């Protein structure tokens, strides 16, 4: 079992990563992974892809066929195109409804596993000290702030520790990002070659 110190830290790392990568990016990736599973939704998505290809192919054929010179052929292709387009729109509407439902489920699960867990930990362990401070090292008012709101005096509360973790993670990420940006911006300085003398 992870200690409370590390649990809070890893929850804040997860929250930071989700906020940095982007919730919509993660939702899109999870949707693609969900479509790879053998479900009715994945079959619907495969059918949608097939119909989309067929609509594009029929549209090309229709554009390549002259409506004046070969009207019968063009009209036949047009009817097939319209029928396929209608099927495609129907499946697309169904798939969009399923994606919306999936997105809501993922958002709820993501919130419960990150921010919901953070709030629960802060409520459940509000009177529990995360760790104790050495006695007489800090003045009374500093101990009071560090134990705010309900932890015993002379200890660090989970709320304070949670804020420290969030701040430390974001500052560390900024430092690492700045270091990578600085390394990436360094370009090789060309060394002047000696002039070749012509003989």
Swiss-Prot record:
InterPro entries: Get1 (IPR028945), Get1_fungi (IPR027538), Helix_hairpin_bin_sf (IPR029012). It is a multi-pass membrane protein. Residues 25-110, 173-199 are cytoplasmic. Required for the post-translational delivery of tail-anchored (TA) proteins to the endoplasmic reticulum. Acts as a membrane receptor for soluble get3, which recognizes and selectively binds the transmembrane domain of TA proteins in the cytosol. This is Protein get1. GO terms for molecular function: protein-membrane adaptor activity. Residues 42-99 form a coiled coil. The chain crosses the membrane at residues 5-24, 111-131, 156-172. It comes from Aspergillus terreus (strain NIH 2624 / FGSC A1156). Residues 1-4, 132-155 are lumenal. It is found in: Endoplasmic reticulum membrane. GO terms for cellular component: endoplasmic reticulum membrane; GET complex. It comes from the Eukaryota. Belongs to the WRB/GET1 family. Interacts with get3. Keywords: Coiled coil, Endoplasmic reticulum, Membrane, Transmembrane, Transmembrane helix, Transport. It holds the Pfam family CHD5. One of its GO terms (biological process) is tail-anchored membrane protein insertion into ER membrane.
């Amino acid at each position: 079992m992870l200690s409370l110190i590390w649990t809070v830290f890893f929850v804040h790392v997860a929250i930071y990563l989700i906020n940095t990568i982007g919730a919509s990016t993660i939702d899109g990736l999870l949707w693609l992974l969900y479509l790879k599973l053998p479900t009715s939704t994945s079959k619907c998505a495969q059918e949608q892809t097939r119909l989309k290809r067929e609509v594009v192919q029929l549209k090309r054929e229709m554009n390549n066929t002259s409506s004046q010179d070969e009207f019968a052929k063009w009209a036949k292709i047009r009817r097939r195109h319209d029928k396929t387009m209608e099927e495609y729109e129907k499946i697309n509407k169904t798939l969009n409804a399923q994606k919306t439902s999936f997105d809501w489920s993922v958002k709820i699960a993501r919130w419960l596993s990150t921010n919901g867990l953070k709030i629960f930990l802060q409520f459940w362990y509000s009177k529990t000290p995360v760790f104790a401070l050495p006695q007489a090292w800090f003045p009374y008012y500093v101990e009071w702030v560090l134990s705010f709101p309900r932890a015993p005096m002379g200890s660090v509360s989970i709320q304070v520790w949670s804020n420290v973790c969030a701040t430390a993670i974001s500052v560390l990420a900024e430092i690492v990002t700045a270091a990578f940006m600085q390394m990436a911006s360094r370009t090789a300085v060309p060394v002047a070659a000696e002039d070749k003398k012509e003989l």
